[in-house]
């Protein structure tokens, strides 16, 4: 599907995934992961096929919820005590050189309620939001079923702002119908000492 916007010349192409229930009826529609991200998850052949499908479905639902501004869904998947760190690249007037000098990155730790309130404002003010995932690295945590740490390179686009950075999501998928995110962090680049924030940094 091709998406275009009357007040912006940006255009997005999304492959669509249909989920069917046991009666063969469509129960859900979402935007597909990029092929590389899907292949990264599928490469864990030592995991049950069902687990890999659940992970893909979760990430597809996650990116689709932001594109469709589904604040209700996003609110439902974050734990009430979730650790949420957001970031924003600030570019002052003037040219940013090839080494990135002249730009600054602001980080904010937020509670779930603060994050959802801010996201609500973003959704209202933006004509569109689109996120794309690449470089998907998934770790199964402990012996508890369904607990995963997911590292992703994220490209974020909206009508007035865009950036590229790295997400870490700690999510409980033991019940696929009600995923629970316990940690969500963002950083612009991997740290030179410890790389991308991961499950063992908490």
Please state what every model-predicted region is:
Residues 13-27, 163-180:
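A short, surface-exposed beta-strand/turn
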Residues 42-43, 56, 91-103:
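Acidic/histidine-rich, surface-exposed loop or edge segments in extracytoplasmic proteins
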Residues 1-21, 97-163:
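Surface-exposed, charged secondary-structure patches
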Residues 1-31, 186, 191-193, 198-202:
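Amphipathic, hydrophobic N-terminal targeting peptides for secretion and organelle import
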Residues 63-67, 79, 83, 120-128:
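Sec-exported extracytoplasmic/periplasmic mature domains
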Residues 24-68, 72, 76:
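Short, low-complexity N-terminal intrinsically disordered segments enriched in polar/charged residues
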Residues 69-94:
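Short, well-ordered alpha-helical segments enriched in acidic and aromatic residues
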Residues 23-35, 148-153, 176-189:
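Short, well-ordered strand-loop elements centered on a beta-strand within folded domains, enriched
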């Amino acid at each position: 599907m091709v998406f275009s916007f009357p007040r912006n010349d940006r255009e997005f192409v999304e492959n669509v995934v249909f989920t069917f229930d046991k009666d063969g009826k469509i129960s859900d529609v979402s935007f597909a992961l990029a092929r590389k991200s899907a292949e990264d998850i599928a490469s864990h052949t030592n995991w049950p096929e069902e687990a890999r499908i659940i992970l893909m479905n979760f990430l597809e639902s996650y990116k689709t919820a932001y594109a469709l501004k589904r604040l209700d869904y996003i609110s439902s998947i974050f734990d009430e005590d979730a650790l949420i760190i957001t970031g924003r690249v600030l570019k002052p007037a003037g040219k940013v050189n090839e080494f990135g000098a002249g730009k600054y990155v602001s980080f904010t730790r937020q509670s779930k309620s603060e994050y959802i309130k801010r996201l609500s404002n973003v959704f209202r003010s933006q004509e569109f939001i689109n996120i794309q995932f690449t470089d998907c690295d998934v770790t199964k945590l402990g012996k508890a079923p369904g607990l995963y740490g997911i590292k992703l390179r994220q490209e974020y686009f909206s009508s007035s702002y865009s950036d590229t950075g790295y997400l870490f999501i700690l999510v409980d998928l033991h019940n696929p119908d009600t995923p629970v995110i316990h940690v969500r962090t963002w950083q612009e680049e991997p740290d030179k000492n410890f790389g991308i924030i991961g499950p063992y940094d908490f």
